Amino acid sequence: LMTSGEVRAGIVTGSSQVLCHTDRIAGFCDRISACYPRIRVIAEIENSDDDFESYDKTRALLSAHPDINALYFTAAGVYGGCRAVLSLNRTDIHILAYDKIPATKELMEQHIISAVICQQPAIQGSKPIQLLFDYLTAGEAPDREFYYTAVDIRILENL
């Protein structure tokens, strides 16, 4: 969908200490090793979910590995990382990120991000707090063990 030929990917994550970040990387790597032999992960960096750090580290990553032609952002810091791509005039890089938030939407409209994986971050953030509040203030236990959010992939055409 996003690239043709050999794909040399860089992974930009928030922290190796955050389970959802490491799970995303593991799932990505497992899937590409099983099904997509033309995709190779070149390097992985951590940006502490910070746009300024992401800018510096993504710029250094791309300078050290000019053969990278795809970036997979597993956490925050996408805006800073994309600014690094732009600062190097790397229009050949395809970018995959998470969550349709104003920054990623803007970057998609500017044709910088190719696709985002949406997972309803507002619900993910507010639902646990609401459940905990209801339990602590009213003694209402959650009505089920797991709450799932919808996951979909957005490209410019279905943004």
Task: Report the location of each language-model feature.
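Short, structured loop/turn "capping" segments at alpha-beta junctions
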Residues: 3-9, 35-43, 68
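Hinge/cleft segment of the Venus flytrap/periplasmic-binding protein
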Residues: 16, 120-159
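Short, solvent-exposed amphipathic alpha-helices that sit
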Residues: 19-38, 57, 80-81, 124
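Short hydrophobic segments within beta-strands
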Residues: 12, 72-73, 154
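Glycine-rich, charge-decorated loop segments at or immediately adjacent to ligand/cofactor-binding or catalytic sites
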Residues: 102-113
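Hydrophobic alpha-helical
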Residues: 28, 43-103
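Hydrophobic alpha-helical segments within soluble ligand-binding/sensing domains
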Residues: 1-8, 54-55, 104, 120-137
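Short beta-strand segments enriched in small/hydrophobic residues
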Residues: 8-17
